[in-house]
A protein has these predicted regions:
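Short coil/turn linking the two alpha-helices of tandem helical-hairpin repeats
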Residues: 58-67, 95, 100-107, 145-146, ...
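Flexible helix-coil transition and linker loops at the boundaries of alpha-helical arrays
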Residues: 41-45, 82-89, 122-131, 193-200
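Catalytic-center loop of serine/cysteine hydrolases
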Residues: 1-76
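Alpha-helical protein-protein interaction modules
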Residues: 67, 110-111, 119-122, 136, ...
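Short, charge-rich amphipathic alpha-helical segments embedded
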Residues: 78-108, 234-235
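Alpha-helical tetratricopeptide repeat
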Residues: 47-62, 92, 132, 136, ...
């Protein structure tokens, strides 16, 4: 094992630009030191560029702050694949962009995201069965296709390959929620958050559902209030939680915000979307939505 250290002078005024500068510096330093002999013999300028593009793309997709992140990351991964169609890092990263758009509720056509994510993750695993990210993405796509055993198997494999894989741990939390084990899901989300203390909102959405399904409605509300820009999916859980707490005023406010975004929504839409193995396990959430004033 090696410990690398470096000093870096910068003005803390434009963090995105600074991040790009540090990324380029790290890429060139690592290539120059760790892979010096290989580069001398074989690495071309285009390969160095592809490596930098991959690191930048993964930085964006893991950040998951807004739809532009996954869009730019996808373009960078596709650029890498045009020069190296067998890049498993780019393939699994591309799969993650589609999964992120699905989980973050950013895609206009969410139904297309899961097949796309599964396609690229499967291709990555064909080339490299030890790709932890591909296993994690593939596992979560299996969940929304209602293949629960396969979902957990791939997520377990991802964690076996990388015990610190926060997305895989959160993915396990989702599987446990939808297979009726919310208490165990809370443990997995706790692990995920310990590895990623600045999580994408889908971690918090899943954690809130686990709290809700264990009758911890205050915890569900507090979790969702950590999300900077809640969307209709987050607000539905908020509305149901407030309603279960007897705060009908707040529940109605969240309901109205949801209906302003999707005027034709009914609680049956949630029944269809959420992949519960046992349909009875969603009924507590449905009851909360009805208490909040949503239509059946």
């Amino acid at each position: 094992n090696y410990l690398w250290s470096e000093t870096f002078d910068a003005v803390m005024t434009d963090l995105p630009v600074l991040q790009d500068e540090i990324t380029r510096h790290i890429v060139m330093t690592l290539i120059g030191n760790i892979e010096q002999n290989a580069i001398r013999d074989s690495v071309t300028k285009s390969e160095v560029t592809a490596y930098a593009d991959t690191i930048r793309a993964r930085q964006l997709v893991y950040r998951m702050r807004d739809p532009a992140d996954t869009k730019t990351a996808r373009e960078l991964f596709q650029k890498v694949l045009r020069t190296d169609s067998a890049s498993t890092t780019a393939l699994s990263g591309l799969a993650l962009t589609y999964l992120a758009d699905f989980l973050m509720m950013w895609a206009e056509d969410r139904n297309a995201c899961i097949p796309q994510a599964a396609h690229y993750a499967s291709h990555a695993l064909e080339l490299d069965p030890a790709d932890s990210l591909a296993h994690a993405v593939f596992g979560i796509t299996y969940l929304w296709r209602r293949h629960y055993i396969e979902a957990m198997a791939h997520l377990d494999q991802a964690i076996s390959l990388n015990p610190n894989h926060a997305d895989a741990l959160a993915g396990r939390g989702l599987v446990l929620i939808f297979t009726g084990e919310p208490e165990s899901a809370l443990v997995e989300f706790g692990k995920a958050l310990s590895h990623n203390p600045f999580p994408p909102s889908w971690y918090l959405w899943g954690l809130a559902i686990a709290h809700y399904n264990t009758d911890r409605y205050v915890d569900a509300v507090q979790t969702l209030l950590r999300i900077d820009n809640p969307n209709r999916f987050h607000r539905r859980v908020l509305a149901a939680s407030y309603a279960q707490l007897g705060d009908i005023g707040q529940a109605a406010a969240e309901r109205d915000a949801v209906m302003a975004e999707v005027p034709n929504y009914t609680v049956n839409d949630s029944r269809r979307f959420q992949p519960y193995q046992d349909p009875q396990n969603i009924e507590s959430f449905i009851n909360g939505l009805l208490l909040a004033g949503f239509l059946d």
